[in-house]
Amino acid sequence: MGDRERNKKRLLELLQAAGTGNGHCADCGAADPDWASYKLGVFICLHCSGVHRNFPDISKVKSVRLDFWDDSMVEFMTHNGNLSVKAKFEARVPTFYYVPQASDCLVLKEQWIRAKYERQEFMAEKAVSPPGDREGFLWKRGRDNSQFLRRRFVLLSREGLLKYYTKEEGKTPKAIINIKDLNATFQTEKIGHPHGLQITYRKEGQTRNLFVYHDSGKEIVDWFNALRAARLQYLKLAFPDLPESELVPLITRNYLKQGFMEKTGPKHREPFKKRWFALDPQERRLLYYKNPLDAFEQGQVFLGSNEQGYEVWEGLPQGIRGNRWKVGLTVITPERKFVFTCPTEKEQREWLESLRGVLSSPLSPLHLLTTSAKSG
């Protein structure tokens, strides 16, 4: 066996070695990484390796299976490995900081990787402090048109408020948003920008959507994590008895599923109309919009639990036919049946799986607090 094959075999054994963490990407957690940084000593996935290529002074990558590895490189990988290197570069990641997963957008992964290895923000000797107040300009989509305009945003973390102004030196904010009602989620495809962020909050019983971006990836991710820090501060005050580990999933959330379906009205005789749907698992709401970038939803369906009589059925009620799309599903609530059609069987399966996941899960502490506050 030549050096090439012998070293490839050693690397593949390292990927499987127990207690190393090498079986998942060191940066996003994707399973079965087949690339590695021989300068840092970590195994990474193909997508994250593309980010590493952007700073060759700090990281240099090779394919585990396709590239040639000399003995010294393999020795370096053997003496390091994912868990060992993560212990160094992720020693002090703040609780509020969003650590991206494999399914997250590129800007989150890129800034996480740069923060770790290039800026070395999370080393043991670095002091960790919350971002605090923040002020700056973001490009915001107009409520009634598709034009993005430069707007000044101000985050007051201690007061738990986010404000934005239409005039750069304006004294009166266009909106004052309470952090307790705020969510932020990257929606790059929907917004059509690689740094696109969707901020939502409750306004007069509806969900107001703000679509923003910044030309700098670092700037938009810093804004995102500053909002998360303010959210965590609020949650600690709202739930003083809950451990931080239970609060972290409540800081911000992504939609469980989004996409187009067609819906009919409460009598099931109304014409089916195409709408954009977004499933919010934490607030247990299925929101629908005329268009994906609308400022407000047209309506929503609250999703309780199976124990409360909420169900989702595959298919349409007998005698009901969709408009263009023939496959569908029916959501049963104590008040009525909601009937939807899906463009494909794949979409139908994904909606059924997502909806059933919400209906089978217990209500979160945040939702229980919101419900008790409303009933009180």
Swiss-Prot record:
Tell me which tissues or organs this protein is expressed in. Answer: Expressed in many tissues, with highest levels in fat, heart and skeletal muscle. Also detected in kidney, liver and lung.
GO molecular function term, any single one: GTPase activator activity
Biological processes, Gene Ontology terms: heart development
Zinc fingers (C4-type), renumbered ranges: 25-48
What GO cellular component entries does it have? Answer: cytoplasm; intracellular membrane-bounded organelle; mitochondrial envelope; plasma membrane
Using the record's annotation, list all stretches that form the Arf-GAP domain. 9-130
Q: Which UniProt keywords apply?
A: Cell membrane, Cytoplasm, GTPase activation, Membrane, Metal-binding, Repeat, Zinc, Zinc-finger
Q: Where in the cell is it found?
A: Cytoplasm; Cell membrane
Q: Main subcellular localization, coarse class?
A: cytoplasm
CDD domains the record matches: PH1_ADAP, PH2_ADAP
Superkingdom of the organism of origin? Eukaryota
Query: Could you tell me which residue ranges the PH domain spans?
Result: 131-232, 254-360
Q: Where is the signal peptide?
A: none
Spell out the InterPro entries in the cross-references. Answer: Arf-GAP_dual-PH_domain (IPR052589), ARFGAP/RecO (IPR037278), ArfGAP_dom (IPR001164), ArfGAP_dom_sf (IPR038508), PH-like_dom_sf (IPR011993), PH1_ADAP (IPR037849), PH2_ADAP (IPR037851), PH_domain (IPR001849)
PANTHER family linked to this entry:
ARF-GAP WITH DUAL PH DOMAIN-CONTAINING PROTEIN 1-LIKE PROTEIN, ARF-GAP WITH DUAL PH DOMAIN-CONTAINING PROTEIN 2
Q: What does this protein do?
A: GTPase-activating protein for the ADP ribosylation factor family (Potential). Binds phosphatidylinositol 4,5-bisphosphate, phosphatidylinositol 3,4,5-trisphosphate (PtdInsP3) and inositol 1,3,4,5-tetrakisphosphate (InsP4). Binding of phosphatidylinositol 3,5-bisphosphate and phosphatidylinositol 3,4-bisphosphate occurs at a much lower affinity. Possesses a stoichiometry of two binding sites for InsP4 with identical affinity.
Q: What is this protein called?
A: Arf-GAP with dual PH domain-containing protein 2
What species is given as this protein's source?
Rattus norvegicus (Rat)
